Amino acid sequence: QALAVPCGKEDGGAFAYQPGKKGELVANNDASAAAVLGLLGKGMAVGDANAVKDPVCTKGDDLTAEQSAQNGAHYLAATLAASPYLEQPPMPGAEDAEPQPDFGNTADAVVSLAASGHKDKATASVKWLEKNAGTWAKQGGPAASAQLIFAAHATGADARDFGGTDLVKQLNATGPSPAATALPSPTPSGPQPSSGTESDDGGLGLWWLVGIGLLFGAGIGFLLSMRRKKQQP
């Protein structure tokens, strides 16, 4: 809870990336989405589940992991209620000084809301991603496609027709080819397995590729974060 913004304050329930120079906590969308999943003990491959009661922000210094996660979900739900997408500040030196849509963290927030039982709070965001994230996913490489696949999977959307884009095919096209699913050893009396490999849609191969994509994206995000810190006075 050391990085959680207390409920009742501005952006209450959110999580900070790290304390400021004076110990202040500033809400960070990336940290908030990740904290919700981490506190719930869930990974990115969250299954589609029915929504439960609305998230609440619980005050206190001795909260359970579940309560802290729900606080984070409360912040994400409130933020996405005001706008279907999260924003990111402009890069230092950028010509456009206005905040830009943050496709990646919006997708991650969708997964976190679904994981915490608030899929209904992410409905508008999923629709927004379907309509607007196509170009970003193509330019962002495997990590971007993977994030959208997870968001679709968590909310019951079709990853093979996400705003007209087959995200699975797009991810597979980045390579390497999906690994074939292991087949049982044949027995003299049993059926003989097919000699071919799984199609490019193979379940194990898909999630393996998704994992590789997210690791790649995490590395890029870390490098950008370090670059921003170096450019700050």
Predicted segments with their positions:
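An alpha-helical repeat/solenoid feature that recognizes helix-turn-helix modules
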Residues: 1-50, 61-71, 78, 82-121, ...
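Buried hydrophobic core positions in alpha-solenoid tandem helical repeats
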Residues: 1-3, 76, 129, 171
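Alpha-helical repeat scaffolds
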Residues: 49-54, 122-134, 161-175
